[in-house]
Curated annotation (Swiss-Prot):
Keywords: Amidation, Antimicrobial, Secreted, Signal, Toxin. It comes from Manica rubida (European giant red ant). It holds the Pfam family Pilosulin. Its main location: secreted. This is U10-myrmicitoxin-Mri1b. Residues 1-26 form the signal peptide. The modification Valine amide is found at V80. It is found in: Secreted.
Length: 81
């Protein structure tokens, strides 16, 4: 019979934790809105495929890797072939 009290106790603790949780408030910065709008306008003008697929994504990652860390890219090229 005591095991039923454990679940009731845990449920009460869970409800109390939710009720007494601190409230959070999102703060909007006008600079962030301006940047997001500029990015959205720039992306709206771009023409391309919405989902380029894994091959194009890997090609972009490989290009960035070769530009940023050429020694690692060379090591990977030697191992892969």
């Amino acid at each position: 019979m005591r095991l039923s009290y454990i679940s009731l106790t845990l449920a009460i603790i869970f409800v109390m934790a939710i009720v007494h949780a601190p409230e959070t408030e999102a703060k909007a910065y006008p600079e962030a809105d301006a940047v997001a709008e500029a990015i959205a306008v720039g992306e709206a003008d771009a023409v391309g495929v919405a989902d380029p697929g894994i091959k194009d994504a890997l090609a972009k990652i490989w290009k960035i890797l070769k530009a940023e860390v050429p020694t690692v890219a060379a090591a990977i090229e030697n191992k892969v072939g």
